[in-house]
Amino acid sequence: MAAIVHIGYHKTGTTWFQDSFYPTVRNRRYIPRATVRAAFLDAGALHFDPAAARRRLGDAPDDMILCEENLTGGLNNGGLAGNLSKDVADRIRRTLPDAQIVIFVRDPLSAIVSAWLQYVKGGGTFGLRRYLFGRDSLSPVAPERDEAPGFRLDHFDTIRLIAHYDALFGPDQVHVFRYEDFRADLRGFAAAYAARFGLDVDLAYIDWSARNPSLSRPLLWLARAMNLFTRRAVADKSWLIDIPGWYGVSRRLLRRANASGRFGRPLATRDLLDDALASQLRAHYAAGERLLTARLQWQARMDKRDGTVLRWRQRPCGHDDLAQSPSHRR
């Protein structure tokens, strides 16, 4: 065995894996997020010590599971323009050179909309276009450019970071999955995923409920209005006044309202991206998406050659639920 390091991306179901799936695995040790962040993100680039990181993670590294989406870099700062994303990959390689790297990717337009909604949930006030392109209007020497960078489209050009991990670990140790395949059949995907990595997990006891549900349109506007009364918790925002404690209160109110289902349906990508912006973004990501497709096709060929679990079938088990039986392709 070797350590499994699930690095994200953001908005690809990592919260569900952290809360519901990995903690139920019986033959591996799931490392808490705080420990993972301390091991790989606390030290500066010139002060990182792989031996210290291994000590923080604990003994028997080969049976560990790590899952932390910020290993790909911060969502609202583009991984510090990709610099942190790239450096963390090197940190993982120096600390756990035999690790199996897991990367989930998502359609970039869907990921962008989900990222903006998460920004609003986290205290953001700006609209989608301002969130995406707000820094484009700054001059090259504007003082704001010396502060924390904002969102960057390149963060979701995921093939670049995948290729970097391929170069560091070898593509056989880097496993890439589409979030859309995961969402299409949670139980089936989880069964095949567990079989792929030899994970001992009883799927009958897993909580399959969604995490971080999307906002409805009324709640989106309400959230942006409430966020004007707190400075927390994102850097790139406006506020009228900072009311102590309001951030926590407003988050609880928003979660309860969203969970009630009384404020309309959750917003989808098509509700928030007009045709012109969608076309602009598709063009931006077109080259990277072609390379990503080729990378996934290569992985599928290698899986077929090696007899890896690729798909699953559902079988009746005597009650309303369905048990999962991994299907091996030889």
Which residue ranges define each predicted feature?
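Anion-recognition interface
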Residues: M1-R330
